[in-house]
Design a protein with these regions (language model features):
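Forkhead-associated
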Residues: 43-120
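Intrinsically disordered, low-complexity acidic Ser/Thr-rich regulatory segments
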Residues: 1-67, 79
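Short, Lys/Arg- and Gly-enriched loop/turn segments at beta-strand edges
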Residues: 121-128
Length: 128
């Protein structure tokens, strides 16, 4: 089927064709690092990790307070180091279990489960 004169086939006639492409930059919405309380008093609940160090415990002096007798007043510290959070036991009575393994400190990864006595939290990594 013959083409109209204004739509030449560049393969046959050696012509060129101009095209216009709109490029939209890809941007992501920042999401904060967070802990989700999935088991324990007040669950379900989300806590944003907005500072370089966040202390979690049952005391009103803790940055994140969870009212459970299984928690020490200052049970754990979450520290942001090199763009990721680490969890540290603050000499708590019941310790920390990370994905079922007792630890003293560790780097956290997306979806990690932290168990502090009967309290269970899930860690979610943020995007900047």
């Amino acid at each position: 089927m013959p083409q109209s004169p204004d739509r030449e086939d560049p393969e046959i006639h050696g012509g060129t064709r101009e095209i216009s492409v709109k490029i939209t930059p890809f941007t992501t919405t920042p999401t904060p690092f967070s802990l989700r309380l999935v088991q324990g008093p007040g669950s379900p609940r989300n806590f944003t990790l907005a500072r370089e160090e966040v202390v979690l415990g049952r005391s009103s002096e803790a940055d994140i307070q969870v009212d459970s007798t299984d928690l020490s007043r200052k049970h754990i510290a979450l520290r942001r180091e090199h763009g990721q959070y680490t969890v540290h036991d603050l000499d708590s009575r019941n310790g920390i279990y990370l994905n079922g393994v007792k630890i003293h400190s560790a780097v956290l990864h997306e979806g990690d489960n932290l168990q502090l006595g009967s309290v269970v939290l899930v860690y979610h990594e943020g995007r900047e």
